[in-house]
Amino acid sequence: MKQESAAQSTPPPSLSPAPSAQPSWEDGDPQALWIFGYGSLVWKPDFAYSDSRVGFVRGYSRRFWQGDTFHRGSDKMPGRVVTLLEDHEGCTWGVAYQVRGEQVSEALKYLNVREAVLGGYDTKEVTFYPQDTPDQPLTALAYVATPQNPGYLGPAPEEVIATQILACRGFSGHNLEYLLRLADFMQLCGPQAQDEHLEAIVDAVGSLLPCSYLSEQPLALI
């Protein structure tokens, strides 16, 4: 059985010192805002945006530690979705979306329901490094589930998490689709993007599932 490790995502090679990230919004009335997605937002943002960039945040590791009773599970059988765990050696890949003008309030209103009300996530500022220009970091808003929210499930062996994922379905689809689409995204990012926790759960699912699972729609890198 694979043991949980605090740092399981491999960051890219060290970069030369980068300038401080510049905030993308001011005084609660932003004209432009970057939103960092590291779970279902990487393939299904469902809000209008002006730009998007693949990249990573440092100091966090992605974990399937948040319970989901709506999108990928139910009250009786909560699914498992990802959150960010503070980890000074961690690196989490995802997509940052830029919203501007009227898109800002529309996106935040939508995400408040999707991520906060239905998902149990809080907001947090993170420093995002675009894959193509890592020396030009951006300040972004991320949705993070903490142990204080009632849906938080916390750590479990990868085999247990895989069993839960295989058994759960919610209004947005099967929990397995969520896992495999996230794994597809990581493969498209290239060999420098690694997430051992995610890979271990995919492997555990493969050992439990006798047949292959195909996503309904192919995933294209944004």
Swiss-Prot record:
Keywords per UniProt: Apoptosis, Cytoplasm, Golgi apparatus, Lyase, Neurogenesis, Notch signaling pathway, Unfolded protein response
Chain residue ranges for the region called Disordered: 1-25
InterPro entries assigned to the protein according to its UniProt record, in alphabetical order: ChaC, GGCT-like, GGCT-like_sf
GO MF annotations in UniProt: glutathione specific gamma-glutamylcyclotransferase activity; Notch binding
GO CC, alphabetical: cytoplasm; cytosol; trans-Golgi network
Active site: 115
Record-listed E.C. numbers: 4.3.2.7
BP-aspect Gene Ontology terms: glutathione catabolic process; intrinsic apoptotic signaling pathway in response to endoplasmic reticulum stress; negative regulation of Notch signaling pathway; negative regulation of protein processing; neurogenesis; Notch signaling pathway; response to unfolded protein
Residues binding substrate, per UniProt: 35-40
Coarse class of the protein's main subcellular location: cytoplasm
Compartments where found: Cytoplasm, Cytosol; Golgi apparatus, trans-Golgi network
Principal EC category: lyase
Reactions catalysed: glutathione = L-cysteinylglycine + 5-oxo-L-proline
Family per similarity comment: Belongs to the gamma-glutamylcyclotransferase family. ChaC subfamily.
Cited PANTHER family: CATION TRANSPORT PROTEIN CHAC-RELATED (PTHR12192), GLUTATHIONE-SPECIFIC GAMMA-GLUTAMYLCYCLOTRANSFERASE 1 (PTHR12192:SF26)
Subunit structure: Interacts with NOTCH1 (via extracellular region).
Protein purpose: Catalyzes the cleavage of glutathione into 5-oxo-L-proline and a Cys-Gly dipeptide. Acts specifically on glutathione, but not on other gamma-glutamyl peptides. Glutathione depletion is an important factor for apoptosis initiation and execution. Acts as a pro-apoptotic component of the unfolded protein response pathway by mediating the pro-apoptotic effects of the ATF4-ATF3-DDIT3/CHOP cascade.
Name this protein carries in UniProt: Glutathione-specific gamma-glutamylcyclotransferase 1
Organism expressing this protein natively: Rattus norvegicus
